[in-house]
Amino acid sequence: MICPVCGFENLTGAEVCDNCGADLAGGGVPQPTLSFHGRLLGEHLDDLGAPPPLTVSPETPVDVAIARMQAAEADCVLVTVDDRLVGIFTDRDAVLKVAGKPIDAHQVGDFMTPDPVVLRHDDPIALAINKMAVGGFRHIPIVQGGVPTGVVTARDVFHHLAETLD
């Protein structure tokens, strides 16, 4: 059964979408009551214009990854092996997991979040908001065929919402 909210193909008979958690047994997609809601369901992550992601390998020294994040004014780096996403390392990881440890002796793979939740470039912005709220995430990688193409951030979503409300 195809989810009417995110387009994910679920197993026949599923009552809840495995991708976004939408109710599949409730008789369809809830209709937006405000034009604002319709835009969130109709606009996709491509509309946010996320730049290409910063990537590092799991073997990258933590201090090098942090320096790259600082230089690019980025909140995270995506961790890849052979161009495939294997993890994410964020500014929050640096503060909560790395602070107080000798960073030159550790690699990003020691502190990254492995196998992060991901989205596709054609997923609705509403799905990103849902996953961030439910999972407590501020950064979600965007992938195409397992290859990272961007990162949607809470900041991106808030800026977009502010523009939408103007």
Where are these regions (language model features)?
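Tandem CBS (Cystathionine beta-synthase) repeat/Bateman regulatory domains
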Residues: 1-166
